[in-house]
Amino acid sequence: FRFDLASIMGRNEDGSPMSKPPILQSLAFDPILGRVKLIAEAWDAGGLYQVGSFPAWNRWSEWNGRFRDDLRCFLKGDYGMAQAAIERILGSADLYSPENRGENATVNFLNCHDGFTLYDMYAYNWKHNEKNGWNNTDGDNNNNSWNCGEEGESMNPEVLALRNRMRKNSFAVLMCSRGAAMFLAGDEFCNTQFGNNNAYCQDNEISWIDWSRKEQYSEMFEFCKFMIQLRKEHPILRGRSGPSGCGFPEVSVHNSKAWNAECNQDTHTIGVMFAGRNASNTEDDIIYIGVNTFWEYCDIELPKLPLGRKWKVLVNTEFEHTQDVDYDLLTRRKSDILLTMCPRSVLVARVEKYFE
């Protein structure tokens, strides 16, 4: 069950927040609901914001609004967002203590039924709710969206290519982040609400899912399927899986230089490496996610590997996705560990064994 504006259930008779709200505690320990997932939208209409502090009793998970906001800002190139983005990708330990709640408490998302769809997030800078009947005064004004140079629908091939890459960047990062991943139905094939970010009152083509777009945006659909399968095949992306045999730490943070975790206001390129064991515990499972939100090409250095192992690029959003694409051959390499990333792109690589 997901509870809309759940923080209202934690207010006292006078409206003040309670530390142990009886209704939330009852739901947490109810024997009939013992095997049911309880998910809170951890804020309410009165301004109470409890992301990271919702009364949980280790039973409630939360929609992580910080994940949405921080990653949207970082991915579109805002300054000073690199460290926050890293925290979100690693499971938001600053919000959900690993000792008490951990990654299972965070439901990561970038889009939901409230706000822009993923397609609209990179097509509109401003909401367009005129058809709702309130002179465009309803809906949130703080969308952290970016239209990639033109407002609304575009015929410019450069704008369209950039929007396509930005959508893939967002979905790839979501699927490579610790915690539960959630995306809005229709985002996998670029459903649009035509810039309306408050479409609850529209029972028409504004809020309906247009299934014809599945064919029109089949390349995005296949990319999303690929990323979902990648997440399933690599449990290290979802949580701890035991120490790796090669001695790498379970998680490590990098900027454009391997093992250099320094971030500042101007940092736009980050790398995150997860190292552990595969699902059958037969070999190491090591995944690296590189994110370049800068508007220029950037060289990124992957960690040097032990003898007999190499990096293989699985995803590179610079290139279109097809079923038989080999990103490893397409990706610009200067050496075994030095790669060139195009502006505003994401790559995912894994460690493979090789024998000469």
Report each predicted region and the residues it spans:
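Short amphipathic alpha-helical segments
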Residues: D14-G15, V51, I300-P303
